[in-house]
Protein backbone atom coordinates (compact mmCIF):
# COMPACT_ATOMS: atom_id res chain seq x y z
CA UNK A 1 0.00 0.00 0.00
CA UNK A 2 1.30 3.45 -0.90
CA UNK A 3 1.29 5.93 1.98
CA UNK A 4 1.23 9.71 1.74
CA UNK A 5 2.46 11.43 4.87
CA UNK A 6 3.41 14.61 6.63
CA UNK A 7 6.33 14.53 9.04
CA UNK A 8 8.02 17.29 11.01
CA UNK A 9 10.72 15.43 12.92
CA UNK A 10 11.04 12.29 10.79
CA UNK A 11 9.04 10.04 13.12
CA UNK A 12 6.01 9.80 10.86
CA UNK A 13 8.16 9.45 7.75
CA UNK A 14 9.90 6.44 9.30
CA UNK A 15 6.62 4.78 10.21
CA UNK A 16 5.11 5.50 6.80
CA UNK A 17 8.14 4.09 5.02
CA UNK A 18 8.15 0.99 7.21
CA UNK A 19 4.47 0.25 6.64
CA UNK A 20 4.56 1.06 2.92
CA UNK A 21 7.69 -0.99 2.33
CA UNK A 22 6.24 -4.02 4.11
CA UNK A 23 3.08 -3.85 1.98
CA UNK A 24 4.87 -3.48 -1.37
CA UNK A 25 4.19 0.23 -1.58
CA UNK A 26 6.05 3.51 -1.32
CA UNK A 27 5.86 6.45 1.08
CA UNK A 28 5.43 9.92 -0.41
CA UNK A 29 5.42 13.24 1.45
CA UNK A 30 2.44 15.55 0.90
CA UNK A 31 5.08 18.25 0.42
CA UNK A 32 6.19 16.57 -2.82
CA UNK A 33 3.33 18.19 -4.72
CA UNK A 34 2.28 16.33 -7.84
CA UNK A 35 3.89 13.08 -6.75
CA UNK A 36 1.60 12.91 -3.71
CA UNK A 37 -1.46 13.73 -5.80
CA UNK A 38 -0.56 11.10 -8.38
CA UNK A 39 -0.06 8.58 -5.59
CA UNK A 40 -3.65 9.11 -4.47
CA UNK A 41 -5.05 9.13 -7.99
CA UNK A 42 -3.31 5.95 -9.07
CA UNK A 43 -4.49 3.63 -6.30
CA UNK A 44 -7.79 2.27 -5.01
CA UNK A 45 -6.29 2.06 -1.51
CA UNK A 46 -3.90 4.50 0.12
CA UNK A 47 -2.49 5.22 3.56
CA UNK A 48 -2.45 8.69 5.12
CA UNK A 49 0.07 9.24 7.92
CA UNK A 50 0.53 12.28 10.14
CA UNK A 51 1.56 13.22 13.70
CA UNK A 52 -1.23 14.14 16.09
CA UNK A 53 -1.09 17.60 17.69
CA UNK A 54 -3.21 17.94 20.84
CA UNK A 55 -5.36 15.01 19.61
CA UNK A 56 -5.94 16.83 16.34
CA UNK A 57 -4.76 16.78 12.74
CA UNK A 58 -1.95 19.22 11.84
CA UNK A 59 -3.20 22.28 9.96
CA UNK A 60 -1.13 21.46 6.89
CA UNK A 61 -2.78 18.02 6.65
CA UNK A 62 -6.27 19.45 7.15
CA UNK A 63 -5.61 21.88 4.32
CA UNK A 64 -4.24 19.12 2.09
CA UNK A 65 -7.37 17.02 2.57
CA UNK A 66 -9.67 20.00 1.95
CA UNK A 67 -7.81 21.19 -1.13
CA UNK A 68 -7.62 17.72 -2.69
CA UNK A 69 -10.91 16.29 -1.49
CA UNK A 70 -12.01 15.19 -4.95
CA UNK A 71 -9.01 12.85 -5.19
CA UNK A 72 -10.08 11.01 -2.03
CA UNK A 73 -13.63 10.40 -3.21
CA UNK A 74 -14.24 6.66 -3.47
CA UNK A 75 -10.76 5.80 -2.18
CA UNK A 76 -10.16 3.34 0.63
CA UNK A 77 -7.90 5.03 3.18
CA UNK A 78 -5.93 3.59 6.11
CA UNK A 79 -5.07 6.31 8.64
CA UNK A 80 -1.72 6.08 10.44
CA UNK A 81 -1.01 8.46 13.32
CA UNK A 82 2.14 9.00 15.37
CA UNK A 83 1.86 10.39 18.88
CA UNK A 84 3.90 11.21 21.93
CA UNK A 85 2.08 10.39 25.14
CA UNK A 86 -1.58 10.48 24.14
CA UNK A 87 -3.69 10.59 20.99
CA UNK A 88 -7.33 9.83 21.84
CA UNK A 89 -8.99 9.84 18.43
CA UNK A 90 -6.02 11.12 16.45
CA UNK A 91 -6.84 8.78 13.57
CA UNK A 92 -10.55 9.39 14.02
CA UNK A 93 -10.27 13.14 13.40
CA UNK A 94 -8.54 12.55 10.09
CA UNK A 95 -10.96 9.76 9.23
CA UNK A 96 -13.94 12.06 9.71
CA UNK A 97 -12.39 14.69 7.44
CA UNK A 98 -11.76 12.05 4.79
CA UNK A 99 -15.29 10.68 5.05
CA UNK A 100 -16.65 14.15 4.30
CA UNK A 101 -14.73 13.94 1.03
CA UNK A 102 -16.27 10.58 0.15
CA UNK A 103 -13.47 8.28 1.27
CA UNK A 104 -14.01 4.89 2.86
CA UNK A 105 -11.95 4.31 6.01
CA UNK A 106 -10.22 0.94 6.20
CA UNK A 107 -8.91 1.45 9.73
CA UNK A 108 -6.62 3.42 11.99
CA UNK A 109 -3.22 2.80 13.55
CA UNK A 110 -1.82 4.77 16.49
CA UNK A 111 1.95 4.59 16.94
CA UNK A 112 3.86 5.94 19.94
CA UNK A 113 7.13 7.63 19.03
CA UNK A 114 9.50 9.99 20.90
CA UNK A 115 7.87 13.36 21.51
CA UNK A 116 8.96 16.03 19.04
CA UNK A 117 8.61 18.91 21.49
CA UNK A 118 12.15 19.62 22.63
CA UNK A 119 11.62 22.82 24.61
CA UNK A 120 9.33 21.51 27.38
CA UNK A 121 11.17 19.71 30.22
CA UNK A 122 8.28 17.47 31.35
CA UNK A 123 8.00 15.92 27.89
CA UNK A 124 11.62 14.83 27.68
CA UNK A 125 12.65 11.22 28.29
CA UNK A 126 16.01 9.41 28.47
CA UNK A 127 17.39 8.18 25.16
CA UNK A 128 16.90 4.56 26.24
CA UNK A 129 13.16 5.11 26.67
CA UNK A 130 12.90 6.81 23.29
CA UNK A 131 14.71 3.96 21.56
CA UNK A 132 12.51 1.41 23.33
CA UNK A 133 9.41 3.26 22.13
CA UNK A 134 10.67 3.13 18.54
CA UNK A 135 11.35 -0.60 18.79
CA UNK A 136 7.88 -1.27 20.21
CA UNK A 137 6.29 0.79 17.46
CA UNK A 138 8.22 -1.05 14.76
CA UNK A 139 6.92 -4.31 16.21
CA UNK A 140 3.36 -2.93 16.23
CA UNK A 141 3.71 -1.94 12.58
CA UNK A 142 4.87 -5.47 11.73
CA UNK A 143 1.81 -6.91 13.48
CA UNK A 144 -0.47 -4.46 11.69
CA UNK A 145 1.05 -5.40 8.33
CA UNK A 146 0.41 -9.09 8.98
CA UNK A 147 -3.15 -8.29 9.99
CA UNK A 148 -3.90 -6.12 6.95
CA UNK A 149 -2.60 -8.81 4.61
CA UNK A 150 -5.46 -10.94 5.95
CA UNK A 151 -7.93 -8.12 5.40
CA UNK A 152 -8.11 -7.18 9.08
CA UNK A 153 -7.29 -3.52 9.71
CA UNK A 154 -6.64 -2.09 13.20
CA UNK A 155 -9.28 0.39 14.37
CA UNK A 156 -7.19 2.61 16.65
CA UNK A 157 -8.82 5.96 17.37
CA UNK A 158 -12.03 5.28 15.47
CA UNK A 159 -14.52 4.39 18.20
CA UNK A 160 -16.91 6.70 20.03
CA UNK A 161 -14.89 6.23 23.23
CA UNK A 162 -11.74 7.31 21.41
CA UNK A 163 -13.65 10.39 20.24
CA UNK A 164 -14.61 11.30 23.81
CA UNK A 165 -11.04 10.75 25.01
CA UNK A 166 -9.59 12.99 22.32
CA UNK A 167 -12.24 15.70 22.64
CA UNK A 168 -12.32 16.01 26.42
CA UNK A 169 -8.77 14.80 27.10
CA UNK A 170 -7.06 17.42 24.96
CA UNK A 171 -8.69 18.93 21.90
CA UNK A 172 -11.50 20.93 23.52
CA UNK A 173 -9.23 22.51 26.12
CA UNK A 174 -6.37 23.33 23.77
CA UNK A 175 -8.25 25.03 20.91
CA UNK A 176 -7.24 28.53 22.16
CA UNK A 177 -3.69 27.31 22.87
CA UNK A 178 -3.20 25.90 19.38
CA UNK A 179 -4.57 29.05 17.76
CA UNK A 180 -2.23 31.21 19.82
CA UNK A 181 0.81 29.03 19.14
CA UNK A 182 0.51 29.63 15.40
CA UNK A 183 1.80 33.13 16.12
CA UNK A 184 4.17 32.37 19.00
CA UNK A 185 7.31 30.98 17.35
CA UNK A 186 10.34 32.74 18.84
CA UNK A 187 13.70 33.25 17.11
CA UNK A 188 16.67 34.44 19.16
CA UNK A 189 18.33 36.95 16.84
CA UNK A 190 21.56 36.84 18.84
CA UNK A 191 21.90 33.08 18.35
CA UNK A 192 20.60 32.99 14.76
CA UNK A 193 23.38 32.76 12.16
CA UNK A 194 21.08 33.28 9.19
CA UNK A 195 22.03 29.88 7.75
CA UNK A 196 18.57 29.38 6.23
CA UNK A 197 17.96 25.82 7.42
CA UNK A 198 14.69 26.83 9.06
CA UNK A 199 13.46 28.85 6.09
CA UNK A 200 14.22 26.16 3.51
CA UNK A 201 12.63 23.45 5.63
CA UNK A 202 9.47 25.23 6.78
CA UNK A 203 6.50 23.43 5.20
CA UNK A 204 4.26 26.51 5.36
CA UNK A 205 6.91 29.05 4.31
CA UNK A 206 6.39 30.91 7.56
CA UNK A 207 10.10 31.69 7.98
CA UNK A 208 12.30 33.78 5.70
CA UNK A 209 15.85 35.13 5.90
CA UNK A 210 15.89 38.92 5.98
CA UNK A 211 19.05 40.98 6.46
CA UNK A 212 20.95 37.87 7.52
CA UNK A 213 18.47 36.71 10.17
CA UNK A 214 15.51 34.34 10.30
CA UNK A 215 12.16 36.15 10.52
CA UNK A 216 8.87 34.45 11.39
CA UNK A 217 5.55 35.42 9.81
CA UNK A 218 2.73 34.41 12.21
CA UNK A 219 -0.57 32.79 11.35
CA UNK A 220 -0.01 29.69 9.25
CA UNK A 221 2.54 27.78 11.36
CA UNK A 222 1.54 24.10 11.51
CA UNK A 223 3.37 23.50 14.84
CA UNK A 224 5.51 20.69 13.41
CA UNK A 225 8.67 21.70 15.35
CA UNK A 226 10.83 21.05 12.29
CA UNK A 227 12.60 24.40 12.59
CA UNK A 228 13.16 23.98 16.33
CA UNK A 229 14.62 20.51 15.87
CA UNK A 230 16.87 21.38 12.92
CA UNK A 231 18.29 24.80 13.83
CA UNK A 232 22.09 24.34 14.22
CA UNK A 233 22.23 27.23 16.70
CA UNK A 234 19.18 26.10 18.70
CA UNK A 235 17.88 29.62 18.26
CA UNK A 236 14.20 28.72 17.81
CA UNK A 237 11.58 27.82 20.42
CA UNK A 238 7.80 27.53 20.38
CA UNK A 239 6.20 26.45 23.65
CA UNK A 240 9.20 26.67 25.96
CA UNK A 241 12.03 29.14 26.38
CA UNK A 242 15.05 26.90 25.75
CA UNK A 243 15.79 23.95 23.50
CA UNK A 244 16.61 21.04 25.79
CA UNK A 245 16.82 18.40 23.08
CA UNK A 246 16.52 18.35 19.31
CA UNK A 247 14.09 15.53 18.68
CA UNK A 248 14.59 14.02 15.25
CA UNK A 249 14.30 10.45 14.02
CA UNK A 250 17.69 10.60 12.27
CA UNK A 251 19.35 11.25 15.64
CA UNK A 252 17.63 8.24 17.20
CA UNK A 253 18.50 6.13 14.18
CA UNK A 254 22.16 7.10 14.41
CA UNK A 255 22.22 6.22 18.12
CA UNK A 256 20.68 2.80 17.43
CA UNK A 257 23.25 2.05 14.73
CA UNK A 258 26.14 3.08 16.96
CA UNK A 259 24.85 0.80 19.72
CA UNK A 260 24.89 -2.28 17.49
Regions found by a protein language model. Name each.
Residues 111-115, 196-209, 254-260:
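Short, highly charged low-complexity linear segments
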Residues 15, 224-227, 247:
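Generic recognition of cysteine residues
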Residues 1-3, 7-14, 20-32, 41-50, ...:
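FMN-binding flavodoxin-like domain, especially the glycine-rich phosphate-binding loop
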Residues 234-260:
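Long, positively charged, glycine-interspersed low-complexity recognition regions
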Residues 187, 193, 197-215, 219, ...:
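Iron-sulfur cluster-binding cysteine motifs and their immediate structural context
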Residues 156, 160, 179-190, 199-200:
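Reductase modules of NAD(P)H-dependent flavoproteins
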Amino acid sequence: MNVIYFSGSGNTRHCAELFAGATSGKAVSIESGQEALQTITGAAEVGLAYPTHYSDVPLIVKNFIAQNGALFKGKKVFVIVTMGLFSGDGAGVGARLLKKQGAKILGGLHLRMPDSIGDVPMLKKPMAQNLAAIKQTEQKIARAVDSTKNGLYPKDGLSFWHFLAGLFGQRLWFIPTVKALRSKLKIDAQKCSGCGVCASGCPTKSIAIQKGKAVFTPGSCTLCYRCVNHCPARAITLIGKRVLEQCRYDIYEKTMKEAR
